[in-house]
Curated annotation (Swiss-Prot):
Pfam families with a match to the protein in the record: ADI
Localization annotation: Cytoplasm
Signal peptide (residue range): none
A biological process term (GO) from this entry: arginine catabolic process to ornithine
Chief location of this protein within or outside the cell: cytoplasm
High-level lineage: Bacteria, Pseudomonadati, Pseudomonadota, Gammaproteobacteria, Enterobacterales
Active site as annotated: 397 (amidino-cysteine intermediate)
A cellular component annotation (GO) from this entry: cytoplasm
Family the UniProt entry places it in: Belongs to the arginine deiminase family.
E.C. number(s) listed in UniProt: 3.5.3.6
Record-given protein name: Arginine deiminase
Organism whose genome encodes this protein: Salmonella arizonae (strain ATCC BAA-731 / CDC346-86 / RSK2980)
Keyword Cytoplasm belongs to the record: yes
One of the record's GO molecular function terms: arginine deiminase activity
Length: 407
C-alpha cells in the first residue's frame, strides 16, 4: 500500500504536489535586480498567477492533491518554535546588527501569520517598517533597499526539496539568491502538522549550516524507480552534494544505485530536468546534447563499507537501460529544426510533469515538441506559459511531488 510522502518514480500515478503561486516576490523583480535574483526577465505577475491557477487546476482535474507553499508556511508559523526559529534564521544579528535585528523580529512576530509568510517569501524593505524603529542601519539605507530580499525562485518548488522513495532531501542551494528558501522548507518539514510526525527519512540538508561546495537542487534529481536515482551534475549540483545524498540513500537502503551525469555548464542546461525528463516506462524527453556519446556518466553503488563504488558508464542511455531493466529506451527529442528545437528547449519543452505513464503537463507554446510527443503516444495536457515561461521553468520545475506511485 502507498505510504504517505513516498515518491517511488518519475512516472507513477502522481497523487500530491506542492506548488507556489506567484506573489509579492515576483512583483519585486525589476530589470535592475532580476539578474541577481536569477531571472532573465520580469514577469506580468497577474498574468503569471492566472497561468499558474490553470496549471494547478489541471492537476486537480486529474485527481492530484495540490498544496500551496504559502499555506503550508502560514500554518507552520502557528507552531511557536517554528516561528521563533524562522525569525532567528531569516533576520540575522550579524547582517543587521543586534539591536535592529531584535526590533525587526519583534515587529514581525506581532504580524498575522499570513502576512509574515508573505514577507518570508516576498521580502521586506526599509520603507515598510514603522517609523518608530530607529537605528543607524535604517539611517544609512534607502526606503527601497531590502532588509530581507525577495525569494522569487520559490516558484520552482522542485529545487528546494525533493522526495526520493521514503525520504526527502532538503537541498542546500548553490546561489545566495536561493539559500534562504531552504529554511522555509526546513521549518515546514520539521513543524507543520502534516510532516512533523511523519515516518520519513531526512537524507540531507536539514541542518542550517554552511554546506560549502556540497550543493544540490531538485531539478537535477530524477527518481527513475526500481531502486535507481538519476542526478545531473550541473552548475547548481556538485559531485560533493551527489556523494552526500548517495551515501544517505544507501545507508537507509532506499536506493541501489545513483547514476550521475555531467551536464554542460551553461544557462540553458541549468538543471537536468531542463534537458531531460522521464515520461513513460521506456521513454525520456531529451534535448540531444545531454545524450551525446562523449557526455560523462557514472554509476554509484554501495562499496559494502559505508563508502561508494564508482563505475564509469559508456553512455547515459546504456546506464538507464541497465537500471530500468529495459532493452532499449525511447528518446523523444526536442521538436522542429535546429532553430526551433533550441527555442523550444529554452522555453521548457523538455521540462514536462508526468502525471502517470504517457500523460504529461507542458507548455502549449512548444508546438513542435508537443507534436512529437503526440506521435510517440504521449498525451500532453497543455497549459499557457507566456509569462510563467519567462522564469525559465516548466511544469516539472514548478512542482514538488509529495506522493507518487512507483513502477
Amino acid at each position: 500500500m502507498m505510504e504517505k510522502h513516498f515518491v517511488g518514480s518519475e512516472i507513477g500515478q502522481l497523487r500530491s504536489v506542492m506548488l507556489h503561486r506567484p506573489n509579492l516576490s515576483l512583483k519585486r523583480l525589476t530589470p535592475s535586480n532580476c539578474q541577481e535574483l536569477l531571472f532573465d526577465d520580469v514577469l506580468s505577475v497577474e498574468r503569471a498567477g492566472e497561468e499558474h491557477d490553470i496549471f494547478a487546476n489541471t492537476l486537480r482535474q486529474q485527481g492530484v492533491e495540490v498544496l500551496l507553499l504559502t499555506d503550508l508556511l502560514t500554518q507552520t508559523l502557528d507552531v511557536p518554535d517554528a516561528k521563533t526559529w524562522l525569525l532567528d534564521t531569516q533576520i540575522s544579528d550579524y547582517r543587521l546588527g543586534p539591536t535592529f535585528a531584535a526590533d525587526i523580529r519583534a515587529w514581525l512576530a506581532d504580524m498575522s501569520h499570513r502576512e509574515l509568510a508573505r514577507h518570508l517569501s516576498g521580502g521586506l524593505t526599509y520603507g515598510e517598517i514603522p517609523a518608530s524603529i530607529k537605528n543607524m542601519v535604517v539611517d544609512t539605507h534607502d526606503i527601497n533597499d531590502f532588509i530581507m530580499k525577495p525569494l522569487p525562485n520559490h516558484l520552482f518548488t522542485r529545487d528546494t526539496s525533493c522526495w526520493i522513495y521514503n525520504g526527502v532531501s532538503i537541498n542546500p542551494m548553490a546561489k545566495p539568491a536561493r539559500q534562504r528558501e531552504t529554511n522555509n522548507l526546513r521549518a515546514i518539514y520539521r513543524w507543520h502538522p502534516q510532516f512533523a510526525d511523519g515516518d520519513f527519512i531526512k537524507y540531507f540538508g536539514d541542518e542550517n549550516i554552511n554546506y560549502d561546495h556540497a550543493t544540490l537542487e531538485g531539478g537535477d534529481v530524477l527518481v527513475i524507480g526500481r531502486g535507481a536515482v538519476l542526478i545531473g551534475m550541473s552548475e547548481r549540483t556538485t559531485p560533493q552534494g551527489i556523494e552526500f545524498l548517495a551515501q544517505a540513500l544507501f545507508k537507509h537502503r532506499q536506493a541501489e544505485r545513483v547514476i550521475a551525469v555531467e551536464l554542460p555548464k551553461h544557462r540553458s542546461c541549468m538543471h537536468l530536468d531542463t534537458v531531460m525528463t522521464h515520461i513513460d516506462i521506456d521513454a525520456f524527453s531529451v534535448y540531444p546534447e545531454v545524450v551525446r556519446p562523449d557526455v560523462q556518466c557514472w554509476t554509484l553503488t554501495p562499496d559494502g563499507h559505508g563508502g561508494l563504488k564508482r563505475t564509469q558508464e559508456n553512455t547515459l542511455v546504456h546506464a538507464l537501460e541497465k537500471a530500468l531493466g529495459i532493452d532499449q529506451v525511447r528518446l523523444i527529442t526536442t521538436g522542429g529544426d535546429a532553430f526551433e528545437a533550441e527555442r523550444e528547449q529554452w522555453n521548457d519543452a523538455n521540462n514536462v510533469l508526468t502525471l502517470r505513464p504517457g500523460v504529461v503537463v507542458g507548455y502549449e507554446r512548444n508546438i513542435w515538441t508537443n507534436e512529437k510527443y503526440d506521435k510517440a503516444g504521449i498525451t500532453v495536457l497543455p497549459i499557457p506559459g507566456d509569462e510563467l515561461g519567462r522564469g525559465r521553468g516548466g511544469a516539472r520545475c514548478m512542482s514538488c511531488p509529495l506522493e507518487r506511485d512507483g513502477i
